[in-house]
Design a protein with these regions (language model features):
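Sec-dependent signal peptide recognition
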Residues: 1-9
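Ser/Thr-rich, low-complexity intrinsically disordered terminal regions
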Residues: 15-145
Length: 145
């Protein structure tokens, strides 16, 4: 009987720890095989882009990120929570819509980013340039390294 109780307690403790861990690690949507996507959580070199390393307050970096996105004429934040954000970027000429996904990871002082075209195959590097331009703006604001 004691063995069953100990086993049950151990099982519940491990199960609770796994649930808490999986809930704290949010994931960006994966990139498709086409080259029109970049993600800081991608496992392959053609899609991978460095995440943003926060050098101060995560809240300050998060607020600055939202401020920068809101200042862009063709970017609209469509959904946000305390630690996730989705925005849409519309191209000037053809009105193509790209998705921007962002996750704030306070545990590692990191902002994970993804930018992907909804249609087509190639984006001529637009998504990578967008994420790097955003990085530069956040670096100028001294909220990321």
């Amino acid at each position: 009987m004691t063995f069953k109780i100990l086993f049950y307690i151990l099982f519940m403790a491990l199960n609770t720890a796994n649930q808490a861990n999986s809930e704290s690690q949010k994931a960006l949507p994966p990139c498709r095989d086409s080259p029109n996507c970049v993600s800081s959580q991608a496992q392959d070199a053609k899609h991978y882009i460095e995440p943003y390393k926060i050098n101060g307050s995560p809240e300050e970096a998060w607020n600055e990120l939202k401020k920068v996105l809101n200042s862009q004429s063709r970017i609209v934040i469509t959904h946000e929570t305390a630690d996730t954000l989705h925005a849409e970027a519309t191209s000037l000429v053809f009105q193509f819509v790209d998705d921007i996904n962002v996750i704030l990871d306070k545990d590692t002082n990191t902002i994970h980013v993804r930018s992907a075209s909804r249609t087509g195959h190639s984006d001529f590097g637009v998504n990578r340039k967008r994420i790097e331009a955003l990085r530069l703006q956040l670096q100028k604001a001294h909220v990321i390294d």
